[in-house]
């Protein structure tokens, strides 16, 4: 396989898929579904946790029900390539990491340098968030798109 060793097999993928659907499933239930003993499932899950394949377990929250209904994507540019470029990128990344309303920050290729996924209580709070980012980071351009509706949103790597 050209020096590439698979980190997980098909059974691990099935286990991950089941945990992505319901992280509270017991090892016994998972074992029954994948055809293993409960102890084998336990060992496989622990191994995937140690390797960092399974990074953690989270509760999926309906953001609208906790008063964060506004979703937006912000595209940022930090200027042209220069000696300050890497420092500018680090500054943007530090600000995004510290900002609780920034859910995701992706360095991208193309016209922009970053794409952020953010949530806000209302348009005014979104505006304040954009101002905080623009005022504290060396951003040369930002473009914001507010989400009208979400057709698909998932964190699943292996569909079930």
Task: Indicate where each model-derived feature is located.
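A compositional/biophysical signature of low hydrophobicity enriched in polar/charged and small residues
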Residues: 1-160
């Amino acid at each position: 396989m050209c020096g590439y060793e698979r980190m997980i097999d098909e059974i691990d993928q099935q286990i991950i898929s089941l945990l992505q659907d319901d992280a509270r499933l017991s090892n016994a239930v998972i074992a029954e579904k994948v055809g293993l003993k409960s102890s084998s499932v336990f060992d496989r899950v622990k191994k995937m946790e140690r390797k960092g394949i399974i990074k953690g377990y989270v509760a999926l929250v309906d953001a609208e029900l906790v008063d964060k209904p506004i979703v937006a994507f912000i595209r940022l540019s930090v200027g042209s390539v220069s000696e300050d470029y890497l420092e500018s990128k680090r500054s943007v990344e530090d600000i995004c990491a510290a900002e609780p309303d920034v859910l995701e920050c992706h360095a991208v290729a193309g016209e922009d340098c970053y794409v952020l996924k953010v949530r806000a209580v209302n348009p005014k709070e979104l505006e304040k968030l954009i101002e905080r980012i623009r005022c504290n980071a060396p951003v040369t351009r930002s473009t914001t798109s507010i989400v009208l509706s979400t057709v698909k949103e998932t964190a699943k790597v292996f569909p079930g």
